[in-house]
Amino acid sequence: MSIKRIFHDPIHKEIVFDSGKPEELMIMELIDTNAFQRLRRIKQLGAASLLFHGAESSRFTHSIGVFCIARKIYQRLIESNSSFYRNKFVLYGAALLHDLGHGPLSHTSEAIFDHNHELWSQKL
């Protein structure tokens, strides 16, 4: 039985995941991990959210939005060249997890703590 999960996004509107599709089931399982869920608490714009009341987006919302864009691009690519098919899981996973290693205050904390979010993403 296929289960659908819907995320309501301010930019992309409804982002639907279907567990009947193996690649989307993988994404749903990744979203449910503690490492990904912590992105809900990290502001997309870091300290700017303290100055601009409209800068409220999280790395969680951003990452799901990036996945949505990657899925649309993939669907277009596959229409023109079926050789892209074998890269679906890698593309989807990379799009979703690209910011997994971000710390508090986003890129600002990288300079303060000498920490690179790409390296932390790989470690996680």
Question: What do these predicted regions represent?
Answer:
Residues 36-46, 94-101:
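Active-site-adjacent bridging/hinge elements
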Residues 22-25, 65, 120:
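Generic recognition of stable, solvent-exposed alpha-helical segments in well-folded globular domains
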Residues 24, 47-48:
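Accessory alpha/beta interaction modules
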Residues 45, 51-90:
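Alpha-helical phosphate/pyrophosphate-handling elements in metalloenzyme active cores
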Residues 1-41:
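Non-catalytic interface/linker regions that flank or bridge core catalytic/transmembrane domains
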Residues 86-124:
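Divalent metal-dependent catalytic cores for phosphoryl transfer on phosphate-bearing substrates
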Residues 20, 60-64, 114-115:
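Generic detection of long, well-ordered alpha-helical segments
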